[in-house]
A protein has these predicted regions:
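Short, solvent-exposed turn/loop segments enriched in Gly/Ser/Thr/Pro and often Arg
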Residues: 1-8, 21-25, 84-96, 148-156, ...
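Formylglycine-dependent
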Residues: 2-82, 88-106, 115-118, 272, ...
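Histidine-centered active-site microenvironments of extracellular/periplasmic hydrolases
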Residues: 5-14, 94-97, 110, 133-200, ...
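Loop/turn elements at helix/coil->beta-strand transitions in domains of secreted/extracellular proteins
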Residues: 14-16, 77-84, 140-146, 189-191, ...
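C-terminal cap/loop subdomain of S1 sulfatases and analogous C-terminal strand-loop tails that border
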Residues: 17, 21-29, 156-184, 201-205, ...
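Flexible glycine/proline-enriched surface loops and loop-helix/loop-strand junctions
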Residues: 48-53, 109-114, 148, 174-178, ...
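A long, amphipathic alpha-helix that forms part
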Residues: 65-73, 103-144, 169, 223
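Long, internal low-complexity/basic segments
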Residues: 216, 302-309, 313-383
């Protein structure tokens, strides 16, 4: 999603080791530069490794973890610090998982698509166990911070979701939240976020202070003892005091903003300011219904609010009761804060009229490499 052109490749953006697919998912291709290697599949995919394609053997998630573990081991053996960012293609459609994982769920009565969806998740769980086992084996836990998180709320493929058949005893589950991926409601943006650092933070705690991805960098900086960050470039705040136990809560005065931010090339972003957005603080979620926008039946099923709404997330985490008429002043403050945010963000929305790339870089590089020697087999590291 960050761009498939060469300047945007991870090995050109500060990463020493990059083992990636292209586009937004394995095998994807769109009418722009966003495209993976031609004909790629979840099993035995062609992967771009530090700027060159290699042919792998195995399931994509297993391969990503194996590659990362091999690199981590090399850093451990060299007594060097490391930062590993492992982003899996799964769980993402098409929903295909290793046979043993799929069978577990078909045996429980799930349809093939659902079984693939849940099988992908189980496979990630297995690989997380493999990662944690190796960190323990290599005695790295005392010096390593481990974070597990997702990038958006509940997605497709689950039991009972948008017409998917319901396996007996396994109805649709979204932790009671309203909305799915693509929605500005809680269920569209709330994700799991777990942290571990042995010997430094007390384990087994649930911290209920609302935080966001923008808080991760300030927290890392605080851990490293960096007190001053570039002004006007780094948003967010450190939640290190919560991790250390120095504080039980942080100020609840700030707002977090969400916008779906999807419009066609050449469209005026200001026309979408009041569509598919939300404002959140510790207690309330204000959800914009989308002025002058029709909400489709599919969007309603996804939890998209047809009108502006305010919810007390402490008393009503499932967003069942719109209290905007009882607290119009709260809604107005949140709407005003969002308006201020948009005015600050709009000048940063550059290249809105830039034409789509006429080429697909991964396709071009793949053809060039096939012409000049072919695609070698990837040699998996010994762990």
């Amino acid at each position: 999603h960050l761009g498939d052109e060469e300047p945007y490749q991870p090995h050109k953006r500060g990463f020493d080791e990059a083992f990636i697919h292209g586009a937004g998912g394995i095998g994807q291709a769109y009418k722009c530069s966003c495209a993976d290697a031609p004909g790629n599949k979840y099993f035995d995919p062609v992967i771009r490794h530090n700027g060159s394609f290699v042919k792998t053997k195995g399931f994509c998630t297993d391969l990503f973890f194996t590659s990362a573990l091999g690199w981590i081991k090399s850093k451990k053996d060299g007594d060097a610090p490391f930062f590993a960012y492992i982003t899996t293609n799964a769980p993402h459609g098409p929903f295909i998982a290793p046979p043993k994982n799929t069978k577990r769920f078909t045996d429980l009565g799930f349809a093939d698509k659902q079984a693939g969806f849940y099988g992908m998740i189980e496979n990630i769980d297995e690989n997380m166990g493999r990662l944690m086992g190796k960190l323990a084996e290599w005695n790295l836990y005392k010096d390593t911070i481990v974070i597990f998180m997702s990038d958006n709320g509940m997605t497709g493929g689950g039991s009972g979701r948008l017409g998917q058949p319901v396996a007996k005893g396994y109805p649709f589950f979204n932790a009671g939240m309203k909305g799915l991926k693509g929605s500005a409601d809680e269920g569209g943006v709330r994700v799991p976020f777990l942290m571990r650092w042995d010997g430094h933070w007390k384990a087994g705690r649930d911290l209920d202070t609302v935080s966001a991805h923008i808080d991760v960098l300030p927290t890392f900086a605080a851990i490293a003892g960096i007190e001053t960050l570039p002004k006007n470039q780094v948003e967010g705040r450190s939640f290190l005091p919560l991790l250390t136990g120095e504080k039980k809560t942080l100020s609840d005065s700030r707002y977090l903003f969400t916008h779906k931010a999807r419009w066609k090339t050449g469209a005026e972003p200001n026309d979408f300011q009041w569509k598919n957005f939300a404002v959140r603080n510790q207690r309330y979620r204000f959800v914009g219904g989308g002025t002058a926008i029709s909400v489709s039946e599919r969007q309603r099923k996804n939890g998209v609010s047809p009108k502006d709404a305010l919810f007390d997330m402490l008393k009503d985490p499932g967003q069942k009761t719109n209290i905007i008429d009882q607290h119009p002043e709260v809604a107005e403050k949140m709407r005003a804060a969002y308006s201020k945010f948009w005015k600050e963000a709009r000048p940063l929305m550059v290249n809105e009229n830039a034409p789509m790339s006429p080429t697909r870089p991964f396709h071009v590089w793949y053809a060039e490499q096939m012409k000049n020697g072919g695609i070698p087999d990837w040699k998996a590291p010994k762990l």
